[in-house]
């Protein structure tokens, strides 16, 4: 009888809890975006994911269309022209 209780205790301790409502988040754009049915207010849709949902990126994300690395140093001196 003690063996049965020990077996049940071990079985219940190793059981993975089921969390309802939590789903695996599908990432896109090199883990920069999240696939959603509709993007949040501060996100922009970009292309589509494998499950035909929009790939939502934060509005501040910059996307390189050419595929080359761009200079992303946006310091004040490089952003505005110098005044004489």
Curated annotation (Swiss-Prot):
<dbReference type="GO" id="GO:0050830">
    <property type="term" value="P:defense response to Gram-positive bacterium"/>
</dbReference>
<protein>
    <recommendedName>
        <fullName>Beta-defensin 119</fullName>
    </recommendedName>
</protein>
<dbReference type="GO" id="GO:0005576">
    <property type="term" value="C:extracellular region"/>
</dbReference>
<keyword id="KW-0929">Antimicrobial</keyword>
<feature type="disulfide bond">
    <location>
        <begin position="35"/>
        <end position="49"/>
    </location>
</feature>
<comment type="similarity">
    <text>Belongs to the beta-defensin family.</text>
</comment>
<keyword id="KW-0732">Signal</keyword>
<dbReference type="Pfam" id="PF14862">
    <property type="entry name" value="Defensin_big"/>
</dbReference>
<keyword id="KW-0964">Secreted</keyword>
<feature type="disulfide bond">
    <location>
        <begin position="28"/>
        <end position="55"/>
    </location>
</feature>
<feature type="signal peptide">
    <location>
        <begin position="1"/>
        <end position="21"/>
    </location>
</feature>
<dbReference type="GO" id="GO:0050829">
    <property type="term" value="P:defense response to Gram-negative bacterium"/>
</dbReference>
<dbReference type="InterPro" id="IPR028060">
    <property type="entry name" value="Defensin_big_dom"/>
</dbReference>
<keyword id="KW-1015">Disulfide bond</keyword>
<feature type="disulfide bond">
    <location>
        <begin position="39"/>
        <end position="56"/>
    </location>
</feature>
<keyword id="KW-0211">Defensin</keyword>
<keyword id="KW-0044">Antibiotic</keyword>
<comment type="function">
    <text>Has antibacterial activity.</text>
</comment>
């Amino acid at each position: 009888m003690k063996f049965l209780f020990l077996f049940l205790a071990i079985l219940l301790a190793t059981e993975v809890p089921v969390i309802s409502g939590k789903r695996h988040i599908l990432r896109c754009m090199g883990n920069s975006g999240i696939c959603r049915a509709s993007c949040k207010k501060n996100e922009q849709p970009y292309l589509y994911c494998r499950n035909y949902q929009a790939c939502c990126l934060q509005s501040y994300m910059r996307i390189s269309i050419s595929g080359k690395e761009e200079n992303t140093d946006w310091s004040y001196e490089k952003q505005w022209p110098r005044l004489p």
